[in-house]
Structure formats: structure tokens, C-alpha cells
């Protein structure tokens, strides 16, 4: 097994599967990206996995149909960037149909876990994200629980996925990376 495989975005418009069972040894989860141009709509059916779609930048309007019912109906989210703005996220279970529309264009990350059954679809606005900021000075960072592990924030939304973000905070953000002290 090779641990040196590099997975790159192909800058494909629409849904792009980046890491999956088909191209990696990942047997429990996958990763993808959605790119939509201004005015573009994307619609697809989710099969064999649950998805957490996390908006990185831009705007999106979401619809999710599940078991013959429209559960998420035109919910809207927007985000300027990952450092300054809290995310908007969408949970989509297996066997659901998702439709996304972007007025100004969007980029989102898609986190997947392979399963045949999921929970109800859920639109998670920024005000329902738990954020913390541990550390001091250049070691300060922000964590954001989007869909948490059991006992944490939003732990009842997904079946298998745990989704969150970690970003650096000012003044360390100017470097856009986190560092640790060198060891001898």
C-alpha cells in the first residue's frame, strides 16, 4: 500500500469526487468538491453514502428531497472566506436528491461516509456552528464543530460523519499555517 498518493482538484465544474473507494484505500469515507459558476444549478441523487456539504466561499440555495418529501426547501447560505466567516453546511443522507443553486458562484467541500441508511436531511446555518479559540498569540487557532461526535455540538445530525474546521487566527493567520516549536 502506498501512502504517497497525491490527490488533486481537477477544477471540474459541478461535483468532483476527489478521494473514493475507487481511487484509494479509503474504505469508510471519501472527499469531494463542488464548484458552481454564477447562475448554475447542480442536482444529483446520493447513493451508498451520507454527505456533509460545507460551503467554503460564495452562496448557495439548497433543496433536499428525502423519502418523497422536500425536507430542505430553498435554504440559503453564503460565506466570504473560511478565516473570517462561519460555515454553512448541508447534511444529505443516502437515497436523497440534492439540488444546489448559486447566484454568484460557489465552492464547497463534500465529506462522505459510506452507508446505506442515514438520518433526516439538515441545513446548518452559521448561527448553529459551535466555535472556540484556544491557544495564545501565534499559537491561537479557531475550531468549529459543524456535525460533532457523540456528546458534542450537533451530534444527532449525521449517522457516521464527524465534520469540523480548524483555521489559524490573527496574528498567526498572516502566515496561513500553524507551526510548533522545533525539537532537539
Would you name each region that the model predicts?
Residues 1-43, 50-63:
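Hydrophobic, proline/glycine-rich low-complexity stretches
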Residues 1-27, 113-174:
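A short, N-terminal "cap"/entry segment at the start of jelly-roll beta-barrel domains
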Residues 31-35, 52, 89-91, 110, ...:
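Conserved hydrophobic/aromatic beta-strand scaffold that supports enzyme active sites
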Residues 38-41, 93-96, 105, 166, ...:
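Tight coil/turn sites that cap or link beta-strands
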Residues 44, 62-63, 92, 100:
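A generic structural signal for residues embedded in beta-strands
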Residues 45, 70-77, 123-124:
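Short amphipathic beta-strand/extended segments with alternating polar/hydrophobic composition
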Residues 47-72, 165-184:
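Glycine- and acidic-residue-biased ligand/ion/polar-headgroup-sensing regions
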Residues 76-118:
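Ligand-binding loop in jelly-roll beta-barrel domains
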Amino acid at each position: 500500500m502506498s501512502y504517497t498518493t497525491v490527490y488533486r482538484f481537477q477544477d471540474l465544474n459541478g461535483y468532483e469526487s476527489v478521494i473514493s473507494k475507487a481511487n484509494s484505500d479509503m474504505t469508510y469515507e471519501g472527499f469531494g468538491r463542488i464548484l458552481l459558476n454564477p447562475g448554475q444549478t447542480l442536482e444529483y441523487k446520493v447513493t451508498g453514502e451520507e454527505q456533509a456539504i460545507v460551503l467554503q466561499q460564495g452562496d448557495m440555495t439548497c433543496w433536499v428531497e428525502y423519502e418523497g418529501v422536500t425536507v430542505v426547501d430553498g435554504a440559503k447560505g453564503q460565506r466570504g472566506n473560511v478565516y473570517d466567516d462561519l460555515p454553512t453546511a448541508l447534511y444529505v443522507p443516502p437515497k436523497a436528491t440534492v439540488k444546489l443553486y448559486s447566484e454568484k458562484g460557489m465552492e464547497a467541500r463534500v465529506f462522505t461516509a459510506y452507508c446505506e441508511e442515514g438520518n433526516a436531511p439538515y441545513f446548518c446555518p452559521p448561527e448553529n456552528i459551535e466555535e472556540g479559540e484556544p491557544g495564545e498569540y501565534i499559537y491561537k487557532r479557531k475550531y468549529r464543530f459543524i456535525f460533532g461526535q457523540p456528546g458534542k455540538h450537533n451530534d444527532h445530525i449525521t449517522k457516521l460523519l464527524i465534520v469540523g474546521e480548524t483555521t489559524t487566527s490573527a496574528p498567526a493567520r498572516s502566515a496561513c499555517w500553524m507551526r510548533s516549536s522545533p525539537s532537539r
